[in-house]
Amino acid sequence: MRHMPVYGVSDYPNQLANEPRVSLRPLGASRRLLTRSYSAKSASPKRSTSSGALPLPKLNYEDLIQADQASNAKNRNVNLPERTFVALRRDLDAWKTTTRGVDELRARQSHVGEAVRAAATPEDKEKAVRKARVLRDSVHTHEREISRLEKSLLTYGLRIPNTSHPDVPLGPESNARIVSTHGPAPIPADPKRDHNKLNDLAEMKFFDRDVGVISSGAGFAYLRGGGALLEVALIAYAMEIAVRKGFEPVITPDVVRRDIADRCGFVPRDEEVKGDEDTEIKTPEQMYAVQSKHESAEGSLVLAGTSEIPLAAMHAQALYNPQTLPRRTVAVGHAFRAEAGARGKDTRGLYRVHQFTKVELFSVTTGEATKRTDNQTTQQTNIDKPSDRELEYLRELQIELYAGLGIPFRVLDMPSEELGASAHRKYDIEAWMPGRGAWGEISSASNCTDYQARRLHIRHRHPHDDTSSAGPLPYAHTLNGTAVAVPRLIIALIENGVRFKEGGDLECLVLPTVLRKHWVGGDKFGEIEIRWE
């Protein structure tokens, strides 16, 4: 059984040494903390233009120590050290006590300072000065302890995955619930429809992994001829639909800071490398590192595993008016996946490659409503959140897109062990691939609630009619979905679309009419005739 890796643990505590200490106030008690990153009068976020480094993530430790967090992590098959929640509760209690203590010491410092100024004799002044020195040393001791506790809290807190939607099925991938099926009835499995075998035909060759090995190494492929044209058409088709529905088109960088990827909770799944309880949990290296002589200035860089990462970074440190949400973007980018643990037949063709083109959907919505109780801010238990509705919107958009391609596909509500670190709920879409004789994932859509927003500092103002507007500014919710993952859609289209003559020779390739206006290769796929239906 695969274990879900734990994300983004190691980098942040080291940043604490250079980060000015700010109050954690687990329930966001102080609005003055917002002045470090946000303007109270402008919707435009304040961003660092020098180094681009973000403040440390703001986690809600009161939520993280709740009893259901441990069972949620277990349900998601996240391998946390047993001491995680005990240590969190211990350190949070100690942080509260130490913070109260330092506040009391500072109040006493103020009184002693007045005593120094009001001293009538040199002896009285010297006595007051000695008290001031003792208090100063005690304050410094408390501050060092607070800094240590904050580092410990963040280290443990970052290991804990997002909450899970109440309707998420429990268990492994096999427990996924089929939500709906679409398109024509699946045709029988047929080995001669295997896209690898079809690619071996000279008249149809549409990809080449052999030259990919020469240029880049195993696991890279060239799309050629009809394969390249099909990628262009699929991208244009997906962008047309998304832009028509109001998504802002974006071309993102393919290189991102490792810190940003960590904050998004992104590492493609693979077999976890586990340490013992007294060591940091480790995960396999699934992202390609970028070596640069400017690394000291730019920080550690990686190739993006998905455009979701740079799209999320677009909103870092943003403060939005709720009336402007949801904000929707669609990006064309490349996804880079090292997939160190991948083995077997899927490494032969296009199903699993190290680099591919992807059209990604991304949304930012308002967060959950908050209420004030006993000077604390808690989230209302509302499963009909704006982000829940946005997830359904993304799912419906994906269904419309794939229905236009005329392939058999189904939507799955993915179980807890398939959610990764960041997803609150996730739908996968699988297409029938008769040459593989199996359903294959072509898309997903995830609601990450405030998991990424807390790490990237994405907030919004209170609605005007919100009675809790005196509380801290809420965190936004982020969502992402795949419009097109090119290689697997090519597999689905070709394996479902080829037509054979009675003798078994290729007759034609049926492609959906919606792609015709984006096709620049006439009515041929290589040397094979295209029939548009």
At which residue positions do the language-model features occur?
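N-terminal alpha-helical targeting/anchoring segments
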Residues: 2-186
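TRNA-recognition modules of translation machinery and tRNA-sensing kinases, especially anticodon-binding
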Residues: 97, 182-533
